[in-house]
Amino acid sequence: MKKIILSAFTATTLILSNSSIFAAPHTISLGIPQQHTFTEKNEDGSKIEADEPSGYFIGIKFPVGFGLGIDSYKTKFKGDTSKIVTFMYNIFYQFPIPVIDIIIGLGSGKTKLACSACAEDYTDPESGKKTGYKAGEASQWFTSFGIQLTQLIDIHMSYRSVTSKKIEQVFSGTKVNYSGNVRGIGLAFNF
């Protein structure tokens, strides 16, 4: 995944190196997740439901139109104390369109389950077996649409499609799929 991100960044930089985007300002973007939905279902066929996620999205866009970012958020499952914790590194491109901001990007990182019995080294006191979960690799693509409020500030909405199929139970080797979609809002500051 890292090779794909680096190759995409290099190719796009070479293709767009004569574009007017090089005069664009630096931008710092701060966002928060608003909704997290899961594409998989529980073992009984019911939908996996989540409470509102907490965390942040941070992005820094450079004058060349490309940027780097970090996503870090936790989503609590409804009716449970368990959470899924997601951490991603992102690379993105902002199209050079006046007044509106359109961003596309890719991310790579980790997801893990967080609960009292989810730690990788957790041993069930009754059975003596390790029943915890290993953190899994995750990837995402995302897009963001923003509108400038002033020359220095814009407000934006984002959509992330997260693939996370590799959270593995230590004892059984069963892999858990917590892929899904995350929607967020944020502000970007130009300088």
Placement of each model-derived feature along the sequence:
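Surface-exposed strand-loop-strand hairpins of Gram-negative outer-membrane beta-barrel proteins
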Residues: 35-56, 127-135, 165-167
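Gram-negative (and chloroplast) outer-membrane scaffold detector with strong preference
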Residues: 32, 56-127, 134-139, 147, ...
